[in-house]
Amino acid sequence: MDLNQRKEKKGQHVGCCGSRTDLSADTVELIERMDRLAENQATASMSIVALPSSFQESNSSDRCRKYCSSDEDSDTCIHGSANASTNATTNSSTNATTTASINVRTSATTTASINVRTSATTTESTNSNTNATTTESTNSSTNATTTASINVRTSATTTESTNSSTNATTTASINVRTSATTTESTNSSTNATTTASINVRTSATTTESTNSNTNASTNATTNSSTNATTTASTNVRTSATTNATTNSSTNATTTASTNVRTSATTTASTNVRTSATTTASINVRTSATTTESINSSTNATTTESTNSNTSATTTESTDSNTNATTTASINVRTSATTTESTNSNTSATTTESTDSNTSATTTASTNSSTNATTTASTNSSTNATTTESTNASAKEDANKDGNAEDNRFHPVTDINKESYKRKGSQMVFLERKKLKAQFPNTSENMNVLQFLGFRSDEIKHLFLYGIDIYFCPEGVFTQYGLCKGCQKMFGLCVCWAGQKVSYRRIAWEALAVERMLRNDEEYKEYLEDIEPYHGDPVGYLKYFSVKRREIYSQIQRNYAWYLAITRRRETISVLDSTRGKQGSQVFRMSGRQIKELYYKVWSNLRESKTEVLQYFLNWDEKKCREEWEAKDDTVFVEALEKVGVFQRLRSMTSAGLQGPQYVKLQFSRHHRQLRSRYELSLGMHLRDQLALGVTPSKVPHWTAFLSMLIGLFYNKTFRQKLEYLLEQISEMWLLPHWLDLANVEVLAADNTRVPLYMLMVAVHKELDSDDVPDGRFDIILLCRDSSREVGE
């Protein structure tokens, strides 16, 4: 039975309370098989005990009670043993339970432990062994559970552990062995789970580990082996997951490793083997993923490596083999990706290499082989890419020694394009029709916020000004030689006549929306997670749209404060911020004092010809005379580029998560509306200076003003201090929202209004010096970071 047939064939399970649950065909077949086995067991042993005919329909304990005598720790058992032992423990619960079972041994043991809960439970099982053991542990929970199972062994063991949770669970299973073991571990969670499975072995093992999470899960599977092993490791996460699969082996192994994440995942697959192995490695991430695949083998292996990322991914594939191998390497990234492919072999291999990047990618391909190989090389990049091709082979082989900078050319691809010359092919036509229905407003000025369901008044303030293709990191939605609208080969283009907003544009806006919801570290990890879609904006939109409702709700929650300030114009008063009044003298200054300080800062910057963006980024007073003498925006930006401001910004801050031109292009046409508002306010600044009785000085022009706000945005130390002091605001991760927020007005301590950006400059100055009205700050620098760390 193929994958689609298995998806279509479903049954309904009537639960014990009369509820109905849709089950897959495999699970229905499993329950029926278990019913028949249970009936055979009941018939064979009727002279001894009457067992229920089904695990789902009745309380078997009550029905069998008249035939069986009860034991001290067991209920209606034949040839069963239930033991519970507690020795020298404090606040410890040890439980052993056996119900309606034959030839069952259930044991729970706790030794020399504090605040430990150890439980072993066996229910309606035959020839089942369930063990839970905890030894010399503190705050440790060890659980072993077996339910409605035949010939099942379930074990959970924790030894000399602290704050460790070890769980082994088997549910409605036949001939299944499920084991979870933790040895000499601290703050370690080890889990092994088997659900509705036949002839399945699931094991999770952690040995001499600290802060380690090891998980092995098997769900609704047949003849499946799932293993997760961690040995002598620190801060390691090892996971092996198999879901709704048949004859599938999923393995994740980590050995003698530090800060390593090793994951192997198989979902809705048949005859699939997925393996992820990391050996003697430090700071290594090794992942192998197979999704909705048949007869597919996906392997990711890292051996004796440092700071190495090895990934193998197969998605919705048939008869596909995807391999990524890294051996004896340092700072090496090896990736093999296969997406929506049939009979496709994708391999990436790196051997005894240093600082080497080897990638092999196959996307939406049939009968395609893509290989990238690097052997005994240093500083070498080897890439092989096949996209939306049939019977295509793309191969790059760098077999060199020494400081090689090879394979910088486009991959040589042998592609048979004849079958794709017809744009009206049925596949392309159906895909185009489906996308047009999903994004119906692309003939108008649609944006991703409309797609998510935001109202026009909300979109006005959440709008992604300045977000363009340069927002995307290099390599994300930026492939050349393909359709600019969908990034597909021209013969497979899914764009349609009259489309004003491209799918690629919606995709980069969707990426910006995801950035709205993530801090720097979370966004880095997200970019790694979507690596299979880096060359496929249409595929990414499909992935993004699945979480459409969730994303909408999350934005509404996280940005409620922002919309209240920018849309409903709720007033920010510094006196409402308790932390601000206690931790900063700026929050006790009058509006006049804040303005005086703002103009003084700019007067000093102009006099010293200090580079503005760098100063507000990290208080660095580098000189840049060309910036102050620039007559137009172009010359201004060229001056910044000449002194390396943009390069330093990318290397020091989260600006490195965008394309190299992103910040530079903010000085072009992106913020015309905000620029108009600022230039209209210049007259107000002159009147303010006259009213304050100070000598009028030239206020910063637009490009200098924008430099200030960009520097403040990427200044991590300043941002954290401001968000701590000003309690009405919270974290935000997009520059356009920061620019909008900076221009709202706030009430100073004397209830006079000042722009928020003036308050920002005052806080920034407070973090650096005591050069403020009324002398020295008396409480400043409560949060001051003398190291002034910037960015990520």
UniProtKB/Swiss-Prot annotation:
Listed Basic and acidic residues bias regions: 394-417
Alphabetized InterPro entries for the sequence: RLR_Helicase
Region feature (25 X 12 AA tandem repeat of N-[SV]-[RS]-T-[NS]-A-T-T-T-[AE]-[ST]-[IT]): 91-390
Disulfide bonding pattern of the chain: none
Cellular component terms (Gene Ontology): cytoplasm
UniProt entry keywords in alphabetical sequence: Repeat
Region feature (Disordered): 113-417
Compositionally biased intervals (Low complexity): 118-393
Top-level taxonomic group: Eukaryota
Sequence repeat residues: 91-102, 103-114, 115-126, 127-138, 139-150, 151-162, 163-174, 175-186, 187-198, 199-210, 211-222, 223-234, 235-246, 247-258, 259-270, 271-282, 283-294, 295-306, 307-318, 319-330, 331-342, 343-354, 355-366, 367-378, 379-390
Protein name per Swiss-Prot or TrEMBL: Uncharacterized protein YBL113C
Organism of provenance: Saccharomyces cerevisiae (strain ATCC 204508 / S288c) (Baker's yeast)
